[in-house]
């Protein structure tokens, strides 16, 4: 059984994205602190924040602080997505497509795959999604990992990244084993049916 992983070029791209996300997160933490003039010392954080709120905040403080708070919360989720892509491995097996990454191990039965669709046709490096008939994330016992994986991909989809080595070979094998036929790459299943009727 062959396992498909992100190529070295894909890993370099993921590393650049990861560094960028960490820089954004550090900037958001610094800007949030300086905008509200609070301390990040665990003992003083809540008391200094409460003092600033009780003293009253101006619009010039509230708007940037809220934007930075959104970045502080959202950026770690983006970092998880990038790390999960970095460690992603796809293995076609007899009973289905096995996906592993960062402690996750999911097996998607071949009969549970309903389609493969291209996410962005116009991209230089397109990403395809494997669409499932139902939610298989219940195989993940850890609720935190289940949430993180679900927010990264959705519960009924699994991306096949542009940086995946031998991606077209994997796509062909998935189509063959799942009985999806010779659906042209990049065409929605409905559109592929329309082409065959033309």
Q: What is each stretch, according to the model?
A:
Residues 1-63, 185-198:
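N-terminal membrane-targeting/pre-transmembrane regions
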Residues 21-29, 68-79:
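Hydrophobic alpha-helical transmembrane segments of multipass integral membrane proteins
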Residues 4-6, 97, 113-116, 130, ...:
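Hydrophobic beta-strand residues in large extracellular and virion-surface proteins
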Residues 122-198:
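A membrane-cytosol interface segment of integral membrane proteins
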Residues 100-138:
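Acidic, Ser/Thr-rich low-complexity segments on the non-lumenal side of membrane proteins
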Residues 71-116:
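Conserved beta-hairpin
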Residues 58-74, 114-125:
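Juxtamembrane/interfacial segments around transmembrane helices
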Residues 2-6, 108, 156-162:
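Generic detection of short hydrophobic beta-strand segments and adjacent strand-loop junctions
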């Amino acid at each position: 059984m062959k396992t498909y992983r992100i190529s070295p070029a894909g890993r370099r791209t993921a590393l650049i994205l990861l560094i960028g996300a960490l820089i954004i997160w550090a900037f958001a933490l610094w800007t949030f602190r300086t905008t509200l003039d609070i301390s990040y010392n665990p003992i003083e954080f809540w008391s200094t924040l409460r003092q600033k709120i009780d003293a009253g905040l101006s619009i010039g403080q509230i708007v940037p602080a809220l934007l930075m708070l959104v970045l502080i919360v959202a950026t770690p989720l983006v970092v998880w997505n990038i790390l999960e892509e970095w460690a992603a491995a796809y293995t076609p097996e007899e009973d289905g497509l096995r996906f592993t990454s960062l402690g996750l191990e999911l097996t998607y039965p071949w009969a549970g795959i309903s389609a493969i669709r291209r996410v962005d046709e116009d991209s230089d490096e397109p990403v395809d999604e494997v669409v499932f008939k139902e939610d298989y994330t219940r195989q993940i016992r850890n609720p935190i990992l289940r949430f993180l994986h679900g927010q990264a991909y959705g519960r009924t989809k699994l991306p096949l990244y542009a940086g995946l080595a031998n991606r077209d070979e994997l796509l062909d094998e998935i189509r063959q084993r799942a009985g999806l036929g010779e659906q042209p790459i990049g065409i929605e299943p409905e559109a592929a049916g329309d082409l065959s009727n033309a």
